[in-house]
UniProtKB/Swiss-Prot annotation:
CDD domains: homeodomain (cd00086), START_ArGLABRA2_like (cd08875). This is Homeobox-leucine zipper protein HDG8. InterPro entries: GLABRA2/ANL2/PDF2/ATML1-like (IPR042160), HD (IPR001356), Homeodomain-like_sf (IPR009057), START-like_dom_sf (IPR023393), START_lipid-bd_dom (IPR002913). Its main location: nucleus.
Length: 699
């Protein structure tokens, strides 16, 4: 038994063979080396899956049940010890509060009125004042109710989403990402917004002082984590990345765990890079929520500044900017739950030319109900380098309570540093900084190839359209919180329907669908296959049975895999009885805009069809790209998390389509059912063709 009273330590295992028949249990104690290895692994992964347990069995020469029961006992012991420590702290705080309460009661007995110097109110007078306040509150409440009823009676009726859907045209055709009407036709005004913007509340002086102190503490903690590498950082025994040593961190931070459930865990990671952007410009992008989303379009789905507190606050050191931000992060697939944070973001220059941007969660006095994630002090250190370069060191340190369970195929990926970790932020920053540098070129670089893009302005217009296409595609992937058709989800396809009200998108009802699967090929192999124009007509419904040629290529990064391309679809004269017809428009005018990239963690291929007239506006450079309607579909390619690079291991592939529903009048329910059936068949057939062409039909 554990001498600390925490139950079995997990280091003694009992067998139940003949000894159990004789009324005794045989005890086998683990060796010190086995215990040391198990303790170290428990710090990194307290909930190992079957594969990890089998790996430990082979390494420590133990039975699977011994490993399983050891981790169960260890978790129970840790929970008991944490509860005991919490109880001791709470008991001490309770005694302190009782002492303070008694002291304040004694002080109240001798308090004097500051106005007249007389004794305090008696009990009867205080009761009389309270009664007057209650009457005043009741009067104000009645006045508010009467005004509210008057407003409701005279407010005009507004159409609901159901009412607007009742007037939707029938499914005479389904347009796969193309607006069949006027290119500049405004989107429908009906339908709910994508998310409810958190309304800011006025901050009192005490709130501002508290937020500034929290930010100052976060900056000081990040200084130590950035500058004392050997003291706080160790290599993970799972994926060889650097993680925070829990014992060393708790000795100096005194951090309080915000989640006590068995599904909660702490993620930590760090990464470093050098980018070709001036430090001041980089800081400005980090502090502007719109530029923050543009800089990390594949991670930051939504962001909003709640309060900007400025620099005139009683904060230790030189605080340049202090603000409260809300952000929603989402990656890879609808099978991966989004993460929401309400953070205090502080930018502070700690030395000449060196800044720290610190984020730390804080929920007090804000309308924020998502309590599944808590960000411990995280952020980046930015150092200005010569020749307009910047060195960026990044730390992510987050507590996560998996209330919404992640799909099993993404668990290995999220358990390492490849999910929401620092490496993903760094590789995205590298890619987007390269793209910004190339987009600022005034002339046509020799790396580009184009038959239709002839000016630098046209080149920038097409690149901006590609950026907006990627942003729209990633926003569409956030459908994990709501599944409109659970019967399709059981078949592996997630379907969602929305009334499109976004500017720059075709107006009407849009059906979004996605499906994710694991493929036993490397991400580079899958990316190369999907990029191959010779085989594209075998899986892409837009070019099925045709010939696809590339007529323009704009390189957006140091690798030629990162590019924006314009594809032309040439129809053939061969007849195919199995050919699926998605729309009746002539394919002589079919073009596709495609934006793709590949980095150290995976890649993305996003594309959307356009007719000749729309593409002419895009490449002319004379029209704002945000006015061009576009509805993208595409693929997200990621490693499966079992290796550290995209050059080995397996692939997790997400396929996502968007379909615009249009036509003549019909009942909305019939439109929805037909649309869902069509898009489900479309995505399922595409996946089957891809699996067949990759020779992995069973994956």
């Amino acid at each position: 038994m554990d001498n600390n009273g925490g139950g079995s330590s997990g280091n003694e295992q009992y067998t139940s063979g003949d000894a159990k028949q004789n009324g005794k249990r045989t005890c086998h104690r683990h060796t010190p080396q086995q215990i040391q290895r198990l303790e170290a692994y428990f710090k990194e992964c307290p909930h190992p899956d079957e594969r990890q347990r089998n790996q430990l069995c082979r390494e420590l020469k133990l039975e699977p049940d011994q490993i399983k029961f050891w981790f169960q006992n260890k978790r129970t012991q840790s929970k008991t010890q944490e509860d005991r420590s919490t109880n001791v702290l709470l008991r001490g705080e309770n005694e302190t509060l009782q002492s303070d309460n008694e002291a304040m009661l004694d002080a109240l007995k001798s308090v004097l009125c500051p106005a007249c110097g007389g004794p305090p109110f008696g009990r009867e007078e205080r009761g009389h004042n309270l009664q007057k306040l209650r009457f005043e509150n009741a009067r104000l409440k009645d006045h508010r109710d009467r005004i509210s009823n008057f407003v409701d009676q005279h407010k005009p009726n507004e159409p609901t989403v159901e009412d607007s859907l009742a007037y939707v045209p029938s499914l005479d055709r389904i347009s796969y990402g193309i607006n069949g009407g006027n290119m500049y036709e405004p989107s429908s005004s009906y339908g709910p917004p994508n998310f409810q913007i958190i309304q800011p509340r006025p901050l009192a002086e005490t709130d501002m002082s508290l937020l500034s102190e929290i930010a100052a503490s976060a900056v000081e903690e990040l200084k130590r984590l950035f500058l004392a590498e050997e003291q706080f950082w160790v290599k993970s025994c799972i994926d060889e990345t650097y993680v925070i040593d829990t014992e060393s961190y708790e000795r100096f931070s005194h951090a309080v765990k915000h989640f006590s459930s068995t599904t909660a865990h702490v993620e930590s990671s760090k990464a470093v890079t050098v980018v070709h952007v001036e430090a001041i410009n980089l800081i400005q992008m980090f502090l502007d929520p719109e530029k923050w989303k543009e800089l990390f379009p594949t991670i930051v789905n939504k962001a909003n500044t709640i309060h900007v507190l400025g620099s005139g606050l009683p904060i230790r050191g030189n605080c340049n900017v202090l603000q409260v931000m809300w952000e929603q992060l989402h990656i890879l697939s609808p099978l991966v739950p989004a993460r929401e944070f309400m953070v205090v973001r502080c930018c502070q220059e700690i030395e000449k030319g060196i800044w720290i941007i610190a984020d730390v969660s804080h929920r007090a006095n804000f309308d924020f109900g998502n309590a599944a994630c808590y960000k411990r002090p995280s952020g980046c250190l930015i150092q200005a380098l010569p020749d307009a370069h910047s060195k960026v060191m990044w730390i992510e340190h987050v507590e996560v309570d998996h209330k919404l369970d992640t799909h099993k195929i993404y668990r290995d990926l999220l358990s390492g540093g490849s999910g929401y970790g620092a490496k993903r932020w760094i590789v995205t920053l590298e890619r987007m900084c390269e793209r910004m540098a190339l987009s600022s070129i005034q002339t046509l670089p020799p790396s580009d190839r184009s038959e239709v893009i002839t000016t630098g302005e046209a080149r920038r217009s097409v690149m901006k359209l590609g950026e907006r296409m990627v942003k729209n595609f990633n926003e569409m992937l956030t459908m994990s919180g709501k599944i409109d058709f659970p019967q399709q989800s059981k078949n592996g396809v997630r379907v969602s329907i929305r009334m499109n009200i976004e500017a720059g998108q075709p107006p009407g009802i849009v059906v979004s669908a996605s499906s994710s699967l694991a493929i036993p090929l490397t991400p580079l192999q899958v990316f190369a296959f999907l990029q191959n124009l010779d085989t594209r007509q075998q899986w892409d419904i837009l070019s099925y049975g045709t010939v696809v040629n590339e007529i323009a290529r704009i390189v957006t990064g140091s690798s030629e895999t990162n590019c924006v391309t314009i594809l032309r679809v040439h129809p053939t004269h061969e007849e195919n009885n199995d050919k699926m017809v998605v729309q009746d428009s002539c394919k002589d005018d079919m073009l596709m805009l495609q934006d793709c990239y590949m980095d150290a963690l995976g890649g993305m291929i996003v594309y959307a069809p356009m007719d000749m007239a729309t593409m002419h506006f895009a490449v002319s450079g004379e029209v704002d790209p945000s006015h061009i309607p576009i509805l993208p579909s595409g693929f997200v390619i990621s490693s499966d998390g079992r290796r550290s690079t995209v050059e080995d291991g397996g692939t997790l592939l997400t396929v996502a389509f968007q379909i615009l529903v249009s036509g003549k009048a019909n009942r909305s329910r019939e439109v929805n059912e037909k649309s869902v059936d069509t898009v489900s068949a479309l995505i399922s057939s595409t996946i089957q063709r891809i699996k067949g062409l990759l020779n992995c039909p069973e994956c």
